Amino acid sequence: MKSINLQRTESLLMELIPQALSQLQNSKINSLPITGVNCKNGKYDAIVYFDGSDFDKDEVKEVIESLKKANGRIKSDVLASTGWYKCPNFKFELDTYLEKSKKIED
């Protein structure tokens, strides 16, 4: 079970990461829906899940590369908004849970 502080951190990142993405110039990622954040090792690492149902496999790879390039900008926006001294290292992954649930419904 996760500690309450870790859950708060994840919840805060769920709000701040889409705000940071919306300020970027890349049209593929500035309105990307973030579906979840999973913090590991305290606040040192965070896996950020996004909904890529609108993209094919090649476009998902491009989106992940764009997110990797924008990682520093996202981290600086999160740091400015929170006042933390350290921001987690973000790893972006496609959320496959939505696709699995659609298959179950069909």
Spans of features found by a protein language model:
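Charge-rich, low-complexity N-terminal segments
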Residues: 1-106
